[in-house]
From Swiss-Prot:
Keywords: Lyase, Metal-binding. It comes from Dictyostelium purpureum. This is Terpene synthase 5. Terpene synthase that converts its substrate farnesyl diphosphate (FPP) into 2 yet unidentified sesquiterpenes. Belongs to the terpene synthase family. Contains several highly conserved motifs that are important for catalytic activity including the aspartate-rich 'DDxx(x)D/E' motif and the 'NDxxSxxxD/E' motif, both of which are involved in complexing metal ions to coordinate the binding of the isoprenyl diphosphate substrate in the active site. Its EC number is 4.2.3.-.
Amino acid sequence: MQEKPNLLSLKKFYFPKEWSYPVNTISKHIRDTFDEAVECGLFDGSNEKHFAYANGVLNCVTWFYPKYDYEQLMVAAAIMQWIFVLDDFLERDHMTDEKQQYCVRKYEDILIQGRSSPYLSTLDDCCLTPLDKYTLVLRKRLLKPSENRIETFNIFVHYLREWFFSIIPLKKSKGDHHTDSVPYEVYSFIRTINIGLYFVVGVNSVAVDTKVHGSFWINPIWQRMVRHAAKQIIIFNDCVSYAKEINHDCAGENCLYILQKKLNLSFEKVYEHVVEEAKQAIFEIQKDEVLLVETLSYLPEEQMNGVKYLIEQLREIVVGNRDWALMTPRYVHNDSPFIETRGTDPSIVPYEKILNSNLY
């Protein structure tokens, strides 16, 4: 680790006062989504650590999507469970480069083609792996609410595949030694995709019939808003995960570490720098909110309401990410430089050790 910093507070991050949203009070989706994964063989239903892992992942949707009903939460939860399992699984020590590439190609194709994928088409159901089965469950859950909006399903699958094709480049970018680091500009480009905000926001394209035209998702103003929101979330998440990433030899994947090396500044000075960057990102989002509504003012009321819904959803995710990150045990660490995430939590589950090596 770089020089040991004094304890700082994450309260320095700026969030507009009007960006205040209650957590979703529905929780049934957590157990139901976990049970689906158990049926597929992803988890052992009798193992408390397995449920603790899943719960730590799935409760994020109650923060990200405060207005969702149960069925919409089930869509979001299936996505999040699949994403976290795949990401954590690919980080396992036994996963060689070849195995990682195979998994990425395989699950991309299953999402696109389902049971017709050449990876599965010749196999009996009993021969499918746990991750094969759960990917089919996810695909079915995505298709159900969007069966009459196939373009939105395609948009969302595009966001998912962009995300999981970014996993390996991010790992490779840090170099062969844990003290190596990628140039900040390269890191920012890859991490903007890898943070996953495009698919987290894109959940709305399948779970909610917003009535917006499919072309909205490539509107350059909207894309810029999501990019700035991703920047804010990257910075905040890199702060809360700083100690854990340093401890796991992932320093080269953290903007705080990269900037300490690049700028030759103390941790405290770098923290001030990134907090200001995050604040400016919020300001850019707010400016583009106004611009987006103005440029789309010609839309009929129903579609404009959908646009405004998505604008508010982006805010909810930015704020929800903060609130979830501060309550999940995933980021608690003895060496955290931040008051809010420092400590030893007995409920912490070592997620990188939970998953069975035969999932794929």
